[in-house]
């Protein structure tokens, strides 16, 4: 009788374990958006990198949440491996500094929503702020990153213009002009240059209209090497 009771208890325990394991497995699977399965969560490679996905919050130019099933910064593996070297280099230059990621892999459906939100701006001008989803952004291939620099407490460096600022003062190409105007300080430009120095050390490419945006490859290269995220 005792043996039967022990066998029954063990069987019930095993059943509960199997059900719980399946639920956890199912929950983990749901967390990964379709197309993201082979991408890398950059914090699994370097936990000192900070992440604050702006489109998973309302703290963005659209003032509304766009990401509901993306809560980590994902990149293509080869891009992620270069990216963590940038953070290592930054910490070598400034031990108290870290890279802070605002956006990484971005589905084209989200790109379309951003594009549509700026429909009051002519198409030719709009491409200065948001890539046309018809062409695809390098973000849509998980090969671009938006970021800044923060200290080990999470305090961001002053770049003279915020993330997603569409004013000309956010343009790297206009820094000398705004310095002469007294609207950017030398320190703010030095902070931007530090970010560029760190990112370009691993071949990332800054664009002339956004101090925060860096492509790991060109759009042409991304189309050849990677699948677009829809």
Which residues fall in each region the model found?
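Bacterial Sec-dependent N-terminal signal peptides
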Residues: 1-29
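Conserved metal-phosphate-binding beta-hairpin within the catalytic cores
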Residues: 214
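Segments that shape or occlude catalytic/ligand-binding pockets
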Residues: 107
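Extracytoplasmic cell-surface/polysaccharide-interacting catalytic and binding patches
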Residues: 23-104, 114-209, 217-230
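Short, well-ordered surface patches within globular domains
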Residues: 110
